[in-house]
Swiss-Prot record:
Family: Belongs to the globin family.
InterPro entries: Globin (IPR000971), Globin-like_OT (IPR050532), Globin-like_sf (IPR009050), Globin/Proto (IPR012292), Mb-like_M (IPR044399)
Identification of the protein by name: Globin-2B
Organism annotation: Anadara trapezia
GO terms assigned for molecular function: heme binding; metal ion binding; oxygen binding; oxygen carrier activity
Lipoprotein in keyword set: no
Keywords associated with the record: Heme, Iron, Metal-binding, Oxygen transport, Transport
């Protein structure tokens, strides 16, 4: 789908679920960002190859480059949440975010591997499938930009 078509999937209910779950996820950006990244690496070990510049990602919090990426990821998500009321602005920030992934040759399919870890992190915060599905729709907007 086009980025516009993917963004059109973000209904009022989906946006509410994103915002409600972000209130919890966004309250510990470093911890939850690290949880997302380490779960991604554990569940999809092949993705570690995209992060070679970070060195040994198995060091977790002790790896400052991984910590930095995790925090940056969470602020990107914050930016997406902040733009939910303006599809045009959301698409602008998503396309800017996508550039960083395109230069690293990360496809939409590869990027979509974050959905499983996101579902697990959400579940650890007592957010069920409805919320994971909302995040998958937002990830779908990024995938469409890749």
């Amino acid at each position: 789908p086009s980025v516009q078509d993917a963004a059109a999937q973000l209904t009022a209910d989906v946006k509410k679920d994103l915002r409600d779950s972000w209130k919890v996820l966004g309250s510990d950006k470093k911890g939850d960002g690290m949880a997302l990244m380490t779960t991604l690496f554990n569940d999809h070990q092949e993705t570690i190859a995209y992060f070679k510049r970070m060195g040994d990602v198995s060091q977790g919090m002790a790896n400052s480059k991984l910590r930095g990426h995790s925090i940056t990821l969470m602020y990107a998500l914050q930016n997406f949440i902040d733009q939910l009321d303006s599809t045009d602005d959301l698409i602008c920030v998503v396309e800017k975010f996508a550039v960083n992934h395109i230069t690293r040759k990360i496809s939409g399919a590869e990027f979509g591997k974050i959905n499983g870890p996101m579902k697990k992190v959400l579940a650890s915060k007592n957010f069920g499938d409805k919320y994971a599905n909302a995040w998958a729709k937002l990830v779908g907007v990024v995938q469409a930009a890749l």
